[in-house]
């Protein structure tokens, strides 16, 4: 099952330490990260930053911006340590570079939870054809 999870996430191009990121999203939202967020809107998934469609899509935009600031990290291969304590994500990583990655993933998971009211099922699988490029800075 774990192998299937990893393959599914890699196929849709989610950035971040995929196992940890997926767990965080599931813990914060109760939603399956692959089916709910991996191809959502114009910013969730492998393409570059585009003009966000709504607050949920903006979460992915900000996540990409957060990852852009990381140095010497491989968001697909690197993993970090975190825990779920009292319904909160706690980044426990001692390596500063990996702790930053954890904080980026924590922020997007919390952002998804806080913006569940903006989630539009019609954007769940967006082909990105009509997404507009943005000059909006990170």
UniProtKB/Swiss-Prot annotation:
Function: Snake venom phospholipase A2 homolog that lacks catalytic activity. It induces local edema. Is myotoxic. A model of myotoxic mechanism has been proposed: an apo Lys49-PLA2 is activated by the entrance of a hydrophobic molecule (e.g. fatty acid) at the hydrophobic channel of the protein leading to a reorientation of a monomer.
Pfam families xrefs: Phospholip_A2_1 (PF00068)
Tissue specificity remark: Expressed by the venom gland.
Localisation: Secreted
Subunit: Monomer.
Principal location class: secreted
Residues annotated as signal peptide: 1-16
MF-aspect GO terms: calcium ion binding; calcium-dependent phospholipase A2 activity; phospholipid binding; toxin activity
Name recorded for this polypeptide: Basic phospholipase A2 homolog Tbo-K49
Similarity annotation: Belongs to the phospholipase A2 family. Group II subfamily. K49 sub-subfamily.
InterPro entries, sorted: PLipase_A2, PLipase_A2_Asp_AS, PLipase_A2_dom, PLipase_A2_dom_sf, PLipase_A2_His_AS
Feature type site, description Hydrophobic membrane-disruption site (MDiS): 130
Organism in which the protein naturally occurs: Craspedocephalus borneensis (Borneo pit viper)
Domain of life per record: Eukaryota
């Amino acid at each position: 099952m774990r192998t299937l999870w990893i393959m599914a996430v890699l196929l849709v191009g989610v950035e971040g330490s995929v196992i940890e990121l997926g767990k965080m999203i599931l813990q914060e939202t109760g939603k399956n990260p692959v089916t709910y967020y991996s191809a959502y809107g114009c910013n969730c998934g492998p393409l570059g930053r585009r003009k966000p469609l709504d607050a949920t899509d903006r979460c992915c935009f900000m996540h990409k911006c957060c990852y852009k600031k990381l140095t010497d990290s491989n968001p697909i291969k690197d993993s970090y340590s975190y825990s779920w304590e009292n319904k909160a994500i706690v980044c426990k990583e001692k390596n500063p570079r990996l702790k930053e990655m954890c904080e980026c993933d924590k922020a997007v998971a919390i952002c998804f939870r806080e913006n569940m009211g903006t989630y539009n099922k019609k954007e769940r699988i967006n082909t990105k054809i009509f997404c507009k490029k943005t000059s909006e800075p990170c």
